[in-house]
């Protein structure tokens, strides 16, 4: 696959803007995520904490919600910031990003565009659980 023309600075700016909207009364750790969609849109999301930390919504999850609210599509490139610095998506979010961008999705890691195959080399295949259930 050819590398698309990605304006990483614009994505970082969108992620930083998203982080300003984070609801973080407990950790004070503001996270923003932004992505380029295959139709050219830039989408973003912020983290939303909960007193029960396990229920905290990661910025990447909010961003994927925005993807679908805007009509869907495939993620091409993603960047995440936490309190203004690069952060790498957690394991749950890596799987979520794989579902919506696949192996060719690029994620900025410490300023370096990194394919999802490096971040999540043994990803759970999309729809595999449901495909297996329908075969039985």
Segments predicted by a language model, with ranges:
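Short, well-ordered amphipathic alpha-helical segments that serve as non-catalytic structural scaffolds
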Residues: 14-17, 59-67
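C-terminal binding/interaction regions
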Residues: 2-18, 70-136
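Compact, glycine-rich, soluble single-domain proteins
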Residues: 47-61
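Short beta-strand scaffold segments in enzyme catalytic cores
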Residues: 28-37
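Alpha-helix C-terminal capping segments
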Residues: 36, 66-71
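Short Gly/Pro-enriched turn/cap motifs at secondary-structure boundaries
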Residues: 23-26
